[in-house]
Amino acid sequence: MADTTHLNGLESCFQRGNLTLKVPMSLFQNNRKRLVARINSNTKVPTTGTFIILEGGVEIPFNDTDICWPFRQESFFQWCFAVEEPGCYGALDLATGTSILFMPRLPPEYAIWEGKLHSLDDFKKRYAVDETYYTDEIAKVLKSKQANLLLTLNGQNSDSGLQAKEATFDGINQFKVDNKTLYPEICE
C-alpha cells in the first residue's frame, strides 16, 4: 500500500515506498480542478446540480480462494483522487469544484486483520478532498446537494480496446445519468 506522508510537514503525498518519488496531493487536486474547468468550458451540461461520479477499482479474488490479487486502482480514479483503498467512489461538483470521497464502511471486526480503522476525517486529510462520506450514503449525499445530473465514464480505451467501467451505486436510478460527456473530456 502506498504511503501518504507529509512533505516538509505541510502537504500529504502519494508514495509507493521510501525509495520512490513523493507526489504531492496538490497534483491530484489540480487534476480535479482542471477536469471541472474543462467540462464547464467545453460542454453544454449545466453546472448547477451536475456532478462527475467516478467509481474506484475493486479487489479481484484469486480463483476460488479467500485471497485477492494485488490491488491496483482504476486509472481515472487514481488520476483524480490518488486513493489506494478498493471499493471507493469520488464525486466532483461542477458548480463549486467541491471534491467528495466515498469510502466503504468497514465493520469493526476488520481491525483484527487491518489494524486501526481510519475515520472519514483521516481519509479527508490523507487524500486532500473537501468532504468524505461512506459509500452507503452516496445517493443520500447527492440528493442533499440537489444533484440532478451525474456524469459517468463510458468509453473505449483507444490503445487496449477495453471498455471503461461506468459507475453504479444503490440509488443511481434516482438521478439523470449522462454517460457520453465525461469520457472524451477526461481523456484529453
Which residues are covered by each model-predicted region?
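A composition/biophysics-driven feature that prefers long, compositionally simple stretches
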Residues: 1-188
